[in-house]
A protein has these predicted regions:
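Gly/Ala-rich beta-loop-alpha elbow adjacent to hydrolase catalytic centers
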Residues: 45-49, 53
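Core-facing hydrophobic residues within beta-strands of well-ordered domains
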Residues: 64-65, 179-182
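Conserved alpha/beta-hydrolase "acid-adjacent" motif
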Residues: 165-171
Length: 185
């Protein structure tokens, strides 16, 4: 079975108060897994979710069979991102959540808002509050998992696309070089 929890403040969990740290997000996902009485599981995370899964492995790595890190890195304040997180935070405050939700998600797709499945992101962002976006940006900015990479013993698949404008090759290569049992695709 597949369980895809929506982090507090996002998607179907938009009414729940959002969290402002990657560690707190990891703990809430682990709580969800524990409530479902799942002892061992495969784990996948994309972008900020990739930071969350790295933190989950740090907290409870013995419960994780295999790890998939998709378009993510080990440094939350993402080097060479299409714009710095500080700029994203500043623009969120100036432009508001509606404009930010129109501006940033298209960057996640090669064909922007014209991409076949873009509507899924667009729909998920509809209920996201400015506070949730602010908390998420700050959570990423303040997180750094670089020191823990060597401790990730789980078999790890790293997936990255060469058109990614958030995470450059140096970020994913850092994951691949420092996670002992990893493979980059």
């Amino acid at each position: 079975r597949v369980i895809a929890p929506a982090l507090p403040g996002f998607g179907e969990s938009y009414k729940i108060k959002s969290l402002n740290s990657i560690n707190a997000m990891a703990k809430i996902v682990l709580k969800c897994i524990q409530e479902k009485k799942i002892n061992k599981f495969n784990l996948m995370g994309h972008s900020m979710g990739g930071m969350v899964v790295q933190e989950i492995v740090k907290i409870a790595g013995d419960k994780v069979n295999k790890l998939i890190c998709f378009a993510t890195g080990s440094i939350g304040n993402i080097p060479d991102r299409f714009e710095s997180l500080d700029v994203s935070i500043k623009r969120l405050k100036e432009d508001g959540i509606k404009e930010t939700a129109k501006r940033i998600p298209p960057k996640w797709f090669v064909h922007g808002s014209k991409a076949k499945n873009y509507y899924l992101c667009e729909n998920a962002a509809k209920e996201t509050s400015e506070e949730t976006a602010y908390n998420a940006l700050n959570a990423m900015k303040n997180w750094n998992g670089l020191e823990n990479l060597k401790n990730i013993k789980n078999e790890t698949l790293i997936i990255w696309g060469d058109k990614d404008v958030s995470y450059n090759f140096n970020q994913v290569e850092m994951l691949n070089k420092n996670v002992p049992n990893s493979k980059l695709e």
